[in-house]
UniProtKB/Swiss-Prot annotation:
Organism the protein comes from: Acinetobacter baumannii (strain SDF)
Catalytic activity annotation: RNA(n) + a ribonucleoside 5'-triphosphate = RNA(n+1) + diphosphate
Name of the gene: rpoC
Function statement: DNA-dependent RNA polymerase catalyzes the transcription of DNA into RNA using the four ribonucleoside triphosphates as substrates.
Subunit structure and binding partners: The RNAP catalytic core consists of 2 alpha, 1 beta, 1 beta' and 1 omega subunit. When a sigma factor is associated with the core the holoenzyme is formed, which can initiate transcription.
Stated name of the protein: DNA-directed RNA polymerase subunit beta'
UniProt GO BP: DNA-templated transcription
Keywords annotated in UniProt: DNA-directed RNA polymerase, Magnesium, Metal-binding, Nucleotidyltransferase, Transcription, Transferase, Zinc
A GO MF label: magnesium ion binding
Length: 1397
């Protein structure tokens, strides 16, 4: 404690000490001697201060003699006052004359009358004392709290060491053996036992024992003990120090006692806890002096132990000690842990001076790098600068005079303020700061009023709106801080989003609407067909009203474009355009072509425009352009006069016919259900499906009706043109509102979800314009309420996810240019169904190639290895028809600390290769966490309307191409078509270049109409299936024979009265009578060649064949109805992302084949099937027990590959890692996380997810230590193992064998090397206990640790400082070594010279 204090002393120390330079911090156990060396005296009395004089009592908890004077340079009795007596110790009161702040650092101690065990090492699991002594926690507690004796030295008696005796047994033994043996109780006994441990001997014994143990539990326990003992041995901690004889006392100013008015005192809880300890300790001393009866002394010792426990960690054992107001007292442990504890409240987050906050309003006239700062605030924030300036300019003689002037607000003060503020950036921050763009620098402009003015374009980055949001202003004081604020944090330098590299400074809402409005064209507007010489002429015509803003005209345009070689060339062209687009052209910078703006400026197009402006023309032009766009957009939106009226919500005339048709269909299904053709689940599914489809049809009719109007053109004919309906324009431009919202206004509200997520099958057929009935309104309140409740809960969850992500990735920084690895990920376009969701160019953009990229057709190298792929190269790759590229990835990076620039690739927020020192870990965490919060805050906007697509029932291709099968197994049906019998099959469609354009999942039992490699036209149907049932398909022909299908036992048969048809349905195991519980209903096919094939029927199967019927290949013998699907909302999303990053095993996860081989089924056990795989390579047979209710996808005799799915379900990431490797795991996690975000339309670069996955894969499990220093079963850093293995292999020894370990982010954060980082994250007590016992050293490599010790962080501009320090140390070490050598040389030469040969 005291040592830490010495370390933390800063340069200007009161006692003139030089600051201690340190590289690492070690934590350990304090010996009694050490505690005494910290102390300035013993606290003997429980008194605090005298209630009359308010002076501290002597030898009490606030004693001035021990802890130092209460007032600066003044002893307690007042004999010595002032500086001149500094260092004098008053002979009357014994107080040293010095500053009062020593009361914050001087410690005291309490000599305990009997030893006391430290509760952390006793109760924090696993109990360290218990592990060392190999006793159970229960037993140790019984000894400690004086319930039983423990034998510490058995002597020649039959007792064993560590044996427990109760009172009776002890007294009997005493009579029998006298003092031949020693048994004690209490902490003394434990201390003696700990002292007796011979670590060396125990370690060697355990090392011999471990290889011989066979039992798993014994092995685990032994290796745990071995680790702990080696830690004690290596760290120079002694086990007996876990029991304390001396208790340190915290300096009094850290546990203050403050007098309140009315003679009461407010005190820190620690004082109460210390008082308790001192009282009991003094009483115990007295009792021992009086030689009181044993039972009384014992009770007192127990109470002392309890009071020390409460002081260290109240509530850890038994009931927490409460104060006067029934509130548990806050102990030392509570002071450091939790959100309000020392770490998170004071070390990682501090309050900042020179800051203010106010409400924000919009500042449409500002430039992008400016913000409006109220004069009042500026005056307060820049006070010291103003004082200095007033003094320097001679307007004020002293600081005091300057202060007066500022208070009076004289006119010259405002002039000074204006000059001080010029070029001095301030930082604006909006809470919650979810990513780094939540804190940006601006140049302040002084304004009247009291609200901060914010530039509208940065609102997206801050996620700010002007409905009462507040923002904080911070002033960077030092020159370096101002420089960094300007160069790195200025809003103009943060145009791209770090999450996806797209512009984040993109106009929205009014601006988009304005730009969209002026760039629309209209048929037969005034002035159509006119020709203009240039844009100025267009302007004049517009101003005089000769031409309408939407008219189609011809204009001669001068444009400057940048050609292939990067040179600018002038062009003059005549274009068909509108006057509005010419207005826009006037603000477009030189270098962009006219065709980029000669279209309707929707939000997407504007974003593209700004993006290409940034890529082609650089930062400065883009910033100016963005501002001009904004001014133009606001102006034109005002002039457009777009507003919303009831008349704008056009209800499609065909709505009622569509709904009537749907109602007929629903009635038909109801009839089928009544006749027993469909099950209740199927009926529900089909009804919901019909309504989902109807909703889409109404929406489509509505959009068609809304989006086009018929107008007469110049020739007087009818022509369709896009509508100028206000609501449609808002939605079409991307300014506000979506098709889904308009659908609720003018189409039908559609299906609603219940609070549990299931869909109510009666939809709301009305829309908001028609109005809802009471019932409809009531149904829709479900969704709305769920939305609000979700929002409240999810915001907290999302914040917590971000915190965990930041914590796991905080120490990942770019540390070197290139690690030289050849590994990486193979990138392919991401195709789902008929859509290329993410083309290859987007996936490889900003990555570095890991190996030469070759053209598929002629194997020519298109791109050499190690190239950074930019937009131009990405486009070339597409043209060359490249289908996959292997790129470098952080997953494969081999840097020891952090990652290398080549593996990371482009810094998304800056658009070039990432700089050294960039903290990519935190960036990744923020990029993933930030949208999480956004999404959770936005759940309720669709009003809980169930967005469920109608189920797919066929593969219909969109492009002409060749059919490709991807691991599809098929059988040929008698009718000629193929039937799919594979589970994970996919069908791809490749174009003429061989690039895949579409990809579809193929369910089991689908009928495939084309063969592999056949041509298919656009719109052709390749496969069909029934989406609501899961068929059982035969793979051989033969005669069906029912096995164990007994009516009323394992099955039930229903006869339909209307048709006389009988169907057999298999009962679920739970619904069967006892006799049918263990039966396995199956259909056995007696094949033509005399064999038999078993088809086991899962529960609820509806059998579609009769006993004895002849069956062909590919026939359906039964179908299993599929259950309904729930609505997917980001509510499913956020917990899903958390589950993925926590690497949780899903419930009922997919079962994968552990080895490749032939499947067979062994003897069943109760409730489980035994699956046997006979491996191809002849190794031992693999068996697995699978619960009977699981549907098994493979049949007897089928061949499976390692990692293939045996039983469907959600994938278990641990299985993927074990069976398919880390690349497959990375792809799985990246795709799954991306699915959740993609569903919400959020773009995140894959890189960020990979960064987190790298951190989750940090550790490995050692399977066999080989010749390395690792023990079997140990968890070690992957990089460490790889390095040690290389070293061992170089000496021709055996390397360690290991298995990569996947850890959830919480666990990974806690298993970091830095104990400071782990302790400040979660489970502070556990982390610190473990670190202290093992004597851990923190090398202060991460960001968090350095923030805690108050240093620059080793990232960004702080990295240089750390590298320089390391360099100097290395130099000093080398220098010392060099000196040693020269001394040796000298000695040698002297010796040689003096020798007389």
């Amino acid at each position: 404690m005291k040592d830490l204090l010495d370390i933390m002393r800063k340069k200007t120390d009161s006692d003139g000490h030089a600051p201690v330079e340190f590289d690492r911090i070690r934590i350990g156990l304090a010996s009694p001697e050490m505690i005494k060396s910290w102390s300035h005296g013993e606290v003997k009395k429980p008194e605090t201060i005298n209630y009359r004089t308010f002076k501290p009592e002597r030898d009490g908890l606030f004693c001035a003699k021990i802890f130092g004077p209460v007032k600066d340079y003044e002893c307690l009795c007042g004999k010595y006052k002032r500086m001149k007596y500094k260092g004098v110790i008053c002979e009357k009161c014994g107080v040293e004359v010095t500053t009062a702040k020593v009361r914050r650092e001087r410690m005291g101690h309490i000599e305990l009358a009997s030893p006391v065990a430290h509760i952390w090492f006793l109760k924090s699991l696993p109990s360290r004392i218990g592990l060392l002594l190999d006793m159970t926690l229960r037993d140790i507690e019984r000894v400690l709290y004086f319930e039983s004796y423990v034998v510490t030295d058995p002597g020649m008696t039959p007792f064993e060491k560590y044996q427990l005796l109760n009172d009776e047994e002890y007294f009997t033994a005493l009579e029998e053996h006298g003092d031949e043996f020693v048994a004690k109780m209490g902490a003394e006994a434990v201390q003696d036992l700990l002292k007796d441990i011979d670590l060396e001997a125990e370690i060697s014994r355990l090392r011999e024992e471990i290889p011989q143990t066979t039992s798993e539990t014994k092995l685990k326990k032994a290796s745990k003990r071995l680790k702990l003992m080696e830690a004690f041995k290596d760290s120079n901690n002694k086990p007996e120090w876990m029991v304390m004889n001396v208790l340190p006392v915290l300096p009094p100013d850290l546990r203050p006692l403050v007098p309140l008015e009315g003679g009461r005192f407010a005190t820190s809880d620690l004082n109460d806890l210390y008082r308790r300890v001192i009282n009991r300790n003094n009483r115990l001393k007295r009792l021992l002096d009086l030689a009181a009866p044993d039972i009384i002394v014992r009770n007192e010792k127990r109470m002392l132990q309890e009071s020390v426990d409460a002081l260290l960690d109240n509530g850890r054992r038994g009931r927490a000690i409460t104060g006067s107001n029934k509130r548990p007292l806050k102990s030392l442990a509570d002071m450091i842990k939790g959100k309000q504890g020392r770490f998170r409240q004071n070390l990682l987050g501090k309050r900042v001076d020179y800051s203010g906050r106010s409400v924000i309003t919009v500042g449409p006239t500002l430039r992008l790098h400016q913000c409006g700062l109220p004069k009042k605030m500026a005056l307060e924030l820049f006070k010291p600068f103003i004082f200095a300036k007033l003094q320097a300019s001679g307007q004020a003689t002293t600081i005091k005079a300057a202060k007066k002037m500022v208070e009076r607000e004289t006119p010259e003060v405002w002039d000074v303020l204006a000059s001080v503020i010029r070029q001095h950036p301030v930082m604006l921050n909006r809470a919650p700061t979810l990513h780094r763009l939540g804190l940006q620098a601006f140049e302040p402009i002084l304004i009247e009023g009291k609200a901060i003015r914010l530039h509208p374009l940065v609102c997206a980055a801050f996620n700010a709106d002007f409905d009462g949001d507040q923002m904080a202003v911070h002033v960077p004081l030092t020159l370096e801080a101002q420089l960094e604020a300007r160069a790195l944090m200025m809003s103009t330098n943060n145009i791209l989003s770090p999450a996806n590299g797209e512009p984040i400074i993109v106009p929205s809402q009014d601006v988009v609407l304005g730009l969209y409005y002026i760039t629309r064209d209209a048929v037969n507007a005034k002035g159509e067909g006119m020709v203009f010489a240039d844009t100025h002429e267009v302007n004049r015509a517009l101003a005089t009203g000769q031409v309408a803003i939407h008219a189609r005209v011809k204009v001669r345009v001068h444009q400057t474009v940048i050609n292939e070689n990067g040179e600018r060339e002038q062009q003059t062209i005549i274009v068909d355009t509108t006057p509005g687009r010419c207005l826009l052209w006037e603000v477009v910078p030189e270098g962009l072509s006219f065709d980029m703006i000669n279209l309707e400026m929707t939000k997407k197009n504007i974003s593209k425009l700004i993006n290409s402006c940034y890529r082609k023309l650089g930062l400065k032009d883009t910033v100016i352009f963005a501002d001009q766009l904004m001014y133009l957009g606001f102006r034109q939106a005002t002039r457009s006069g777009v507003s919303v009226g009831m008349e704008d919500m056009l209800i499609p005339p065909t709505k009622h016919t569509i709904i009537d048709k749907a109602e007929t269909e629903v009635r038909e299904i109801e009839q089928q259900f009544e006749q027993g053709f469909v099950t209740a689940g199927e009926r529900y599914n089909k009804v919901v499906d019909i309504w989902a489809r109807t909703n889409d049809q109404v929406a489509k009719a509505m959009m068609d009706n809304l989006s086009y109007t018929l107008v007469k053109n110049k020739q007087g004919e009818d022509e369709k043109q896009k509508s100028f309906n206000s609501i449609y324009m808002m939605s079409d431009s991307g300014a506000r509102g979506s098709a889904a919202q308009i659908r609720q206004l003018a189409g039908m509200r559609g299906l609603m979800a219940k609070p549990d997520g299931s869909i109510i099958e009666t939809p709301i057929k009305a829309n908001f314009r028609e109005g809802l009935t009471v019932l409809q309104y009531f149904i829709s309140t479900h969704g709305a309420r769920k939305g609000l409740a979700d929002t409240a809960l999810k915001t907290a969850n999302s914040g917590y996810l971000t915190r965990r992500l930041v914590d796991v990735a905080q120490d990942l920084v770019i540390t070197e240019p290139d690690c030289g690895t050849r590994g990486g990920l193979v990138m392919t376009p991401f195709i789902q169904g008929g859509d290329v969701i993410e083309p290859l160019r987007d996936r490889v953009l900003g990555r570095v190639t890991a190996e030469d990229v070759r053209r598929a057709s002629d194997d020519e190298v298109v791109l050499p290895r190690g190239t950074l792929i930019d937009e131009k190269i990405a486009a070339q790759l597409e043209e060359a028809g490249v289908d996959e590229v292997k790129v470098r990835s952080v997953i494969a990076c081999e840097s020891t600390f952090g990652v290398c620039a080549k593996c990371y690739g482009r810094d998304l927020a800056r658009g070039h290769l990432v700089n050294p020192g960039e903290s990519v870990g935190v960036m990744a965490a923020q990029s993933i966490g930030e949208p999480g919060t956004q999404l959770t805050m936005r759940t309720f906007h669709v009003g809980g309307a169930a967005s469920r697509t109608s189920a797919a029932n066929s593969v219909q291709v969109r492009n002409k191409g060749t059919v490709r099968f991807h691991n599809v197994k098929t059988v040929q049906h008698a009718k000629g078509h193929l039937v799919s019998v594979s589970r994970s099959g996919e069908i791809g469609i490749a174009d003429e270049l061989g690039r895949e354009r579409e990809r579809y999942k193929l369910p089991y039992g689908a009928s495939i109409l084309l063969k592999d490699g056949e041509l298919v036209e656009a719109g052709g149907i390749v496969a069909t299936w029934d989406p609501h049932t899961h068929p059982l398909v035969t793979e051989v022909a033969g005669k069906a024979r029912f096995s164990q299908i007994a009516d009323g036992v394992t099955a039930t048969s229903k006869t339909d009265d209307a048709t006389g048809m009988t169907t057999v349905e298999i009962l679920p195991v739970t619904a069967r009578p006892a006799s049918g519980k263990d039966l396995r209903p199956a259909i056995v096919l007696d094949t033509t060649d005399g064999g038999e094939q078993f088809y086991f029927l899962p529960q609820n199967t509806i059998v579609t064949v009769r006993d004895g019927e002849t069956i062909g290949v590919g026939d359906v013998i039964g179908r299993v109805p599929q259950e309904s699907s729930r609505t997917r909302d980001i509510t499913g999303g956020l917990p899903r992302v958390a589950d993925l990053f926590e690497a949780r095993k899903p419930k009922e996860h997919a079962i994968l084949a552990e080895v490749s081989g032939i499947v067979s089924f062994g003897k069943e056990t109760k409730g489980k099937n035994r699956l046997v795989i006979t491996p191809d390579d002849g190794s031992e047979i693999y068996e697995e027990l699978i619960p009977k209710w699981r549907q098994i996808n493979v049949f007897e005799g089928e061949h499976v590959n390692r990692g293939e799915t045996i039983s469907d379900g959600p994938q278990n990431p641990h299985d993927i890692l074990r069976l398919k490797g880390e690349v497959a795991l990375t792809n799985y996690i990246v795709n799954e996380v991306q699915d959740v975000y993609r569903l919400q339309g959020v773009k995140i670069n894959d890189k960020h997810i990979e960064v987190i996955v790298r951190q989750m894969l940090r550790k490995v499990d050692i399977i066999d230590g080989g010749d390395t220093s690792f023990i079997k079963g140990e968890q070690v850093d992957y990089i460490r193992v790889v390095q040690e293995n290389q070293a061992v292999l170089a000496q021709n020894k055996f390397p360690a064998k290991f298995e990569r370990q996947l850890m959830g982010i919480t666990k990974a954060s806690l298993s970091t090397d830095s104990f400071i980082s782990a302790a400040s994250f979660q489970e502070t007590t556990r982390v610190l206990t473990e670190a202290a016992v093992t004597g851990k050293e923190d090398d202060l490599r991460g960001l968090k640790e350095n923030v805690v010790v108050g240093r620059l962080i080793p990232a960004g501009t702080g990295l240089a400082y750390h590298l320089e320090r390391r360099r100097q140390e290395a130099e000093a070490a080398e220098h010392a070594l060099h000196n040693d050598f020269s001394e040796v040389d000298q000695a040698f030469s002297q010796a040689l010279n003096s020798e007389q040969f």
